[in-house]
Amino acid sequence: MQAEIIAVGTEILLGQITNTNSTYIARGLAELGIDSYYQTVVGDNRQRLSTVIEIAAQRNDLVILTGGLGPTKDDLTKQTLAHYLNVALVEDQAAMQKITAWFATNDKVMTANNRLQALYPAGAQPLTNHNGMAVGAFYQSENSADFLLLPGPPRELAVMFDSEAKPKLAAAYGEQAQIYSRVMRFYGISESELATRLQPLIDEQQAVTIAPYAKTNEVTLRLSAQAMTETAARGMIDKVDHQIKATVGPYFYGYGDDNSLVTTVINQMIAAKLSITAAESLTAGLFQSTIGSVSGVSAIFPGGFVTYANEAKHQLVNVPQAIIDAEGVVSEATAKAMASGAKQQLNTDVGISFTGVAGPGTLGGQPAGTVWIGLAYRDRPVKAKQYHFAGNRQQIRERSVMAGLDLLRHALNEDTDLKK
């Protein structure tokens, strides 16, 4: 079973609005086990719309059109489809009553063109618009593709698709193989390196699709499998998931489209009841701001320090002036002293520090992008790690924060490993 989604609207082609409708529909089709290999966007032009309808009908079992069902002159979708099907437009009485009632209730004059919103192609099943006026339709054909008409406004489309269209599609096409996907998230490895290391696994896969995607400062893998039940698809993906972790496990930190490294790390710390503070120089509070975005962080984060100037490092977190004079502010010794000093000042379980050169110039002979991150973790020896980041000033600061979170992640995982 194969479907194509056609989004109608010149405003989409001009980039004036984002086409979220096609994304929403595609996800719903995947849940129903209906494949979708094409998505088309076409402007409000009868001839071009007619052409894309004809092309879509030739290569698909189902064609879904969204947009162009309203009362204005550029709303041409249902008229164009009716012409293609060689059927008339008929009125849905329930929709018409709703339209007239709305104008009467709001004491407004109803113009004749509003009646267009109650029309749908003859022979189709009308679909109620619970959040608007334009009626949708599901047309089943014996000799051609089937058609689904949905409104353009996203809040109207979502409700109609979920409550009206999906049940009809399920009833019409019966049980289809379901597509199940899982997103794996990685930090500390590039997309190219991840793909290279997993290439033998990717090449041998037939039942599970492995697709890498580069995100800001991280990489994700989307694993997809198709089976008659979600349980069967999960089983297929579980096997590949295990093989991926066996190959690049140290870089893996979590699952999900909406997950993030900071959410994963802070939730682990909350669960472990480990308190944290930070002393920040080049990041100037960005680490604390980042962890502050996670709900519930107040349970483990009493506060922290922005120690941009050398005097602040000495006064706020007790970094000995002798260390700064001897080793320099961008050094392993200074990073360690900042982390342990912050931890002692607020009596937390963990102290983390950031000192480095955000750029664009050098500092103490150190080039831009040189960063030391210190970590005082529970009763373990204080350590620090050096990094060299590329990018502009803001990118270096953001990458420093991500590296600090990853340093914390590894420390937390060491705790977990020791308990096993």
From Swiss-Prot:
Enumerate the InterPro entries for this protein.
CinA (IPR050101), CinA-like_C (IPR036653), CinA_C (IPR008136), CinA_KH (IPR041424), Competence-induced_CinA (IPR008135), MoaB/Mog-like_dom_sf (IPR036425), MoaB/Mog_dom (IPR001453)
Where in the sequence is the signal peptide annotated? none
Q: Which residues cross the membrane?
A: none
Which CDD domains does this chain map to? cinA (cd00885)
Q: Which family does it belong to?
A: Belongs to the CinA family.
Q: Which HAMAP family match?
A: CinA_B
This chain belongs to which protein, by name? Putative competence-damage inducible protein
Organism (species)? Lactiplantibacillus plantarum (strain ATCC BAA-793 / NCIMB 8826 / WCFS1) (Lactobacillus plantarum)
Gene responsible for this protein: cinA
